[in-house]
C-alpha cells in the first residue's frame, strides 16, 4: 500500500466554498473523496504526493474543520503510525486550541491504537495545518490512498514536466535495454515528446 499526506487551507464566500478551496489547495479538490476508517497495510509506503486524475474515486482519511467566525484559529491534524503487520491513522481538529497540543493528542491516540493491537510502531508521521479565519475559512489534512488508476498528468506540461518525462523515458530505455520509441506526455493536452531509440527527443 502507498499513501501520501497532504494539507491545505483557504477562504471562501461560504463555508462550503472555503472547504472546497482548501481541498484544491491540498491538491485533492478535483477528485471524489471516499472517506475510509483508519487502517493501513503493514509496511505501508509513504510517498510524495503526485497529481491525481480529475474525477477519480480516491480513498482517504480526512481531517477537516471549517468556520465562518472571523478570528477563529482552526487546526486540522492527521497522525499515521506504520507497523510491520498493519498501520493506523487518526484525525483531530480544534478551534482556538494549541496546535502542538492537538498534535500530541493525535500521536497519543494513534500510539494507543497500535498498542491495543499489539503492533510495534516502526514510524509515526504527523501533519498539522492551522488557519486564521478572515470570513469563512477551512483547513484540511488528509492521508490519501494511492494506486495506479488515480495517478496521472493533470493539464498541460510545462518545461519542467517535459524534462522530467524525457529523463524518465531515457532512464527506462537504458535500464530495460530494449529499442523502444515511447511517447510521453498528456494525450489530451496535445503536447507530446517522442523519444527515439537512443533515448533522445526527436
Regions found by a protein language model. Name each.
Residues 1-202:
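Helix-coil modules at protein/domain termini and other flexible surface or pore-lining loops
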Amino acid at each position: 500500500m502507498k499513501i501520501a499526506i497532504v494539507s491545505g487551507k483557504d477562504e471562501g464566500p461560504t463555508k462550503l466554498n472555503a472547504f472546497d478551496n482548501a481541498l484544491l489547495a491540498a491538491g485533492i479538490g478535483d477528485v471524489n473523496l471516499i472517506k475510509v476508517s483508519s487502517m493501513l497495510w503493514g509496511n505501508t509506503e509513504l510517498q510524495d504526493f503526485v497529481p491525481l486524475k480529475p474525477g477519480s474515486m480516491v480513498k482517504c482519511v480526512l481531517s477537516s474543520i471549517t468556520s465562518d467566525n472571523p478570528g477563529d484559529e482552526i487546526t486540522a491534524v492527521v497522525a499515521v503510525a506504520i507497523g510491520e503487520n498493519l498501520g493506523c491513522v487518526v484525525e483531530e481538529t480544534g478551534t482556538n486550541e494549541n496546535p502542538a497540543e492537538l498534535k500530541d493528542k493525535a500521536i497519543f491516540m494513534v500510539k494507543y491504537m497500535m498498542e491495543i493491537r499489539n503492533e510495534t510502531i516502526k514510524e509515526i508521521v504527523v501533519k498539522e495545518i492551522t488557519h486564521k479565519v478572515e470570513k469563512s475559512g477551512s483547513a484540511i489534512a488528509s492521508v490519501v490512498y494511492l494506486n495506479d488508476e488515480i495517478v496521472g498528468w493533470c493539464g498541460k506540461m510545462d518545461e519542467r514536466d517535459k524534462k522530467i518525462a524525457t529523463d524518465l523515458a531515457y532512464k527506462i530505455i537504458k535500464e530495460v535495454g530494449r529499442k523502444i520509441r515511447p511517447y510521453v506526455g498528456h494525450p489530451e493536452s496535445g503536447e507530446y515528446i517522442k523519444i527515439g531509440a537512443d533515448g533522445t527527443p526527436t
